[in-house]
Design a protein with these regions (language model features):
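A structural supersecondary motif
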Residues: 196-210
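Glycine- and acidic-residue-enriched helix-capping/strand-helix junction motifs
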Residues: 38-66, 70-71, 107-118
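Active-site-proximal C-terminal subdomain of hydrolase catalytic domains
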Residues: 157-192
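Hydrophobic helix-and-loop "lid/oligomerization" segment in the mid-to-C-terminal part
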Residues: 79-131, 137-151
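Acidic/polar loop patches that form or flank catalytic/metal-binding clefts of enzymes
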Residues: 21-23, 74-82, 135-138, 178-189, ...
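Glycine-rich phosphate/diphosphate-binding loops that line cofactor/substrate pockets in enzymes
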Residues: 15-33, 72, 87-93, 128-129
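Generic beta-strand/beta-sheet core signal
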Residues: 24-26, 33-36, 40-42, 81-83, ...
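Single conserved hydrophobic/aromatic residue that forms the stacking wall/gate
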Residues: 1-6, 10
Length: 210
């Protein structure tokens, strides 16, 4: 059911929160940016409609952007900017940036490294350069290399593949439901090390989640 799909999203992990979550529903304005903000296909990942999944409106559902719009006051202006540049003359202090992996299945997901895309990093930097506090939501099927970037982020949540119910994500962001998620495995400093090189250190240990 839709309710059970949304409730599953509440198990995602908030891993860094510098007084951003819960976000006020009465905020004057909120910027929502990133490739994944308005992308159902990216939310769902592989094995969705097609073998490799797809981008955009490949099925019926609620994007994270739409979930945010439904959560806030009618007086709150939600500005959608894919790369964090075209904001017009709107002033504000909070940007929610949805980044992560494109859909994949099986060996198509094999990669030499698990670094963030330069496009995603640039979007975040565009907003930080404008003075915004940035809350990063990472869509992925595995831990990625974020250690070098985390200090630049004011908040971070691993939302994995939330599926069609983007409103489940916004419920957590705006305090309608408390995130109950705890990591079921460690998040390494370098994702390529995984569990095979614990001596290289961990970013987050098993069971972590705010």
């Amino acid at each position: 059911s839709l309710s059970s799909a949304a409730s599953d999203v509440y198990k995602r992990q908030v891993l860094k929160n510098e007084n951003l979550i819960p976000i006020s529903k009465e905020s004057k304005s909120i910027v929502v940016a990133g490739r994944g903000a308005d992308n159902l296909g990216m939310q769902c990942g592989g094995w969705t409609i097609n073998w490799q999944g797809g981008q955009g409106d490949i099925t019926i559902g609620t994007t994270i952007l739409d979930g945010i719009k439904e959560s806030v006051s009618t007086e709150t202006k939600v500005i959608h900017s894919k790369d964090g540049t075209d904001l017009g003359n709107v002033s504000g202090d909070l940007a929610i940036v949805v980044i992560g992996e494109d859909p994949y299945t099986e060996f198509f997901g094999d990669k030499d490294n698990l670094d963030l895309l330069e496009e995603d990093i640039q979007t975040i930097n565009n907003l930080k350069d404008k003075g915004y506090k940035v809350l990063v939501l990472l869509i992925s099927g595995r831990p990625m290399n974020i250690a070098d970037h985390l200090d630049n982020w004011d908040g971070f949540a691993a939302i994995w593949l939330p599926g069609t119910e983007g409103n489940g994500v916004s419920d957590i962001l705006f305090g309608d439901f408390q995130s109950t998620g705890k990591l079921s495995y460690p998040w390494p400093l370098n994702a390529e090390d995984g569990a095979n090189a614990p001596e290289n250190g961990l970013l987050y240990n098993i069971g972590f989640g705010l």
